[in-house]
Amino acid sequence: MYPAHLLVLLAVCVSLLGAASIPARPLNLYQFGNMIQCANHGRRPTRHYMDYGCYCGKGGSGTPVDELDRCCQIHDDCYGEAEKLPACNYMMSGPYYNTYSYECNDGELTCKDNNDECKAFICNCDRTAAICFARTPYNDANWNINTKTRC
């Protein structure tokens, strides 16, 4: 093997080792954001739901501050149920990483029939939450709250 080939091989190995230490990004959350935009016809940016109340965003605890926050609590619980399914219990198959097939037609969301059991469950979690977000009032006072004192 030529020295140049060894250098290329070494560079590839180092790159792969570095990539292995980078946590994977939740691919499904991108789809969930698109579902939210479909259901609310783009009236409110998805980022407004990332840090709302006690449950919208990472984690969640306490009592939901309003109906919109309750939508997020139900969504969190739905993802928790998905994680218990045997079909969702293998590497990178859980609700945060497993992508699914769906359609958006004029604000109507449909999970496609070609989803396996896990994908169908996750898709329905996201669909239900997106519809809930679209029909529930948004209270600006509940965005970016102090969760330590209010939740």
UniProtKB/Swiss-Prot annotation:
It comes from the Eukaryota. One of its GO terms (cellular component) is extracellular region. Residues 1-27 form the signal peptide. Expressed by the venom gland. It is an enzyme of class 3 (hydrolase). Disulfide bonds join 38-104, 54-151, 56-72, 71-132, 78-125, 88-118, 111-123. The active site is at 75, 126. Binds 1 Ca(2+) ion. It is found in: Secreted. GO terms for biological process: arachidonate secretion; fatty acid biosynthetic process; lipid catabolic process; phospholipid metabolic process; positive regulation of fibroblast proliferation. Its cofactor is Ca(2+). It catalyses: a 1,2-diacyl-sn-glycero-3-phosphocholine + H2O = a 1-acyl-sn-glycero-3-phosphocholine + a fatty acid + H(+). The keyword Disulfide bond applies. PROSITE patterns: PA2_ASP (PS00119), PA2_HIS (PS00118). One of its GO terms (molecular function) is phospholipid binding. Ca(2+) binds at residues 55, 57, 59, 76. Its EC number is 3.1.1.4. SMART domains: PA2c. Pfam families: Phospholip_A2_1 (PF00068). Keywords: Calcium, Disulfide bond, Hydrolase, Lipid degradation, Lipid metabolism, Metal-binding, Secreted, Signal, Toxin. PLA2 catalyzes the calcium-dependent hydrolysis of the 2-acyl groups in 3-sn-phosphoglycerides. Belongs to the phospholipase A2 family. Group I subfamily. D49 sub-subfamily. This is Acidic phospholipase A2 3. It comes from Tropidechis carinatus.
